[in-house]
Amino acid sequence: MKSVGLITEYNPFHNGHLFHATLSKQRSETNVTIAIMSGNFVMRGEPAIYHKFKRTEMALSAVDLVVELPLIGSLSSSDTFAEIAIKTAQYLDIDIISFGSESASLKDLQYLATQMIDYEKHPDFKEKLKQGKSYPRILSELTHNDTLLQSPNNILGISYLKAMQQFAPHMSALTIKREGSLHHQKVIDHHHFASGTSIRRSLMNDNVDWKNVVPNQIQSLYCKPHTTVEDTFPFIKHQLITQPKESLHSIYTINEGFENRLQTMIHRSDSFESLLSNLNTKRYTQTYIQRVLMNVLLNITKDDVNKEINAVRVLGMSEKGRSYLKYLKANYPNRHYITNVNQKTAHYFKNEIKATHVYNLLSNQSQTDFNTPLVRI
């Protein structure tokens, strides 16, 4: 069975995602479409607006199999996000990775990916990082290509292509041009497509604009967001005030000395937004700071990080997805494709289980990794 993989967050699922999934199936000429989806926390450095089980149900309107991207991928830089996603795709024997981009020129993006792998080995690259320059800015300077590197989906696509060259050279790639609104557009201003940011804002504000840009057949699944990033503040504050500096230093993604700034600025902040503003510097992007704060919230330490894939958590599937899962189990009997988390399998997903517990504290949800059945359609 030939498969195409989509690396996703679906926060929430919308017409742009449906467009991407539909064209990916058509252009890849594959039998099965697989979504590797972030769980309850997403790459922006915040909790997803709906828990992963609801988002899985949404996704199955367009794909055949949904698996969870390991938490470490979701709360990392684009390169680590891509590395873990591609390794997960390899574990699932995916043939083609399809991603959206502003460029839609696979040749240009692959050329930049190859350039970057070489540039990152140079002493100049590491020196610029030490100077506090952001990763996209350094790459823009080194490659002399501002246009492609100004677009977030291009940058992420390049990270996928780098990871494929390094970890899965047999895998093919396909890119599909994004349609409609810009990635971080805050207002729904298109009759069919909109950014995730604008849809989340519409849902939060209880207006109905989101209905124009979400597939009709799944609109009944949408409701006011389960939680927002602001809900995390009391828990983050507790962690920063009660944890010793040495413990904070061990938190995943914290760079040398940033724990000092965290413990200073928490006493000057009365909300997540104000903490973010107080922590802001030229050296660190807002997204980096938010991911650090989520790792503080979840107490994810450097010792918790494992970039190898030892098992995959299956969240949901269609009949076609079920057939593909049977194919995987028959062809890779030593791999672990987990559809039911229990005492025997929980050790594979310690970070994800903890993230679900914390998400439930934030959102007053009750669906855990142990009591929620596989989503089937």
From Swiss-Prot:
One of its GO terms (cellular component) is cytoplasm. SUPFAM superfamilies: Nucleotidylyl transferase. It comes from the Bacteria. GO terms for molecular function: ATP binding; ligase activity, forming carbon-nitrogen bonds; tRNA binding. It is an enzyme of class 6 (ligase). Its EC number is 6.3.4.-. HAMAP family: TmcAL (MF_01539). Belongs to the TmcAL family. This is tRNA(Met) cytidine acetate ligase. The lineage of its organism: Bacteria, Bacillati, Bacillota, Bacilli, Bacillales.
